[in-house]
Amino acid sequence: MGQKGFLVRSPVILSVDPELTIMGYAKKEGQSNRIVISEWALDSEMLGGLILHELAHIYFTEWGAHSHDGELLEEVLRGLKEREGLRAKETEFLIDAFNHLQNILVDDIVFAVMNEKELETTKQFFAEWVSDRPSGDPVLDAALLTRNAFATASLKRRKLFEPNSEMCFRNKEFVSALGQHAEGEYDWLEGFLENSKPDLNRKQFLASIGEYFERILALMRSSARLDDLR
């Protein structure tokens, strides 16, 4: 990363957690940062990409990116709670949506330093994220729709998306099953993530996140259901 101009200034400690169920995460510890890796991830082909990904999160935090400002996220969620009365599950999935935005931004660094083999592995990784059948629960389906948009936008942003791939057909099946309104919202979500920029000022970033969250929340509160799931 440093050779590409993305220098992490603080010391970084790597550790393994045998009880961790996710692949890994990064956290601040005083003047240092720690990347915690699950034991099972040590054998994964994605290990190198995972470490790069977590280092990129640390870089964005050191840089002071609004996407990695926890207080800003709390401000947006607090405003939504006051206006809309968010439920716990809605809040959880909106935080997931914010994580998708964080990830697509930091992955600009990751994709820039990956080799060809790592890129192919990552394409398959994102393909496995795509859901093809809605659950019938609008809250969960809005979260799945956003995750599909993130996976597709991640590849389109780096010119790696294949329009005739199984991933593409699975996503189309999912979106069309939710109906015409969801198709329009999906297009907006995918475009928002594909074209998101890390250098917006605070006011611009707050406005963009506000619209992003409000659109997802509207989908969560939609009464639409699949006919065969009613």
Q: Which residues make up each language-model segment?
A:
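Auxiliary, metal-adjacent structural segments of Zn-dependent hydrolase domains
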Residues: M1-G30, L42-S44, E92-L94, L217, ...
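Glycine-rich, often proline-containing surface loops adjacent to acidic residues and nearby aromatics
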Residues: Q31-I35, E84-L86
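Short pre-active-site segment immediately N-terminal to the catalytic Zn-binding motif
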Residues: I35-I51
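Post-HEXXH active-site segment of zinc metalloproteases
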Residues: E45, F60-I95
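Short, solvent-exposed secondary-structure capping/transition elements
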Residues: M46, T61-G70, I109-T122
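Catalytic glutamate of the conserved HExxH
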Residues: L50, E54-I58, E62
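Short helix/loop segments within enzyme catalytic domains
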Residues: E92-L94, L101, L105-R133
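Pan-zinc metallopeptidase signature
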Residues: E118-R230
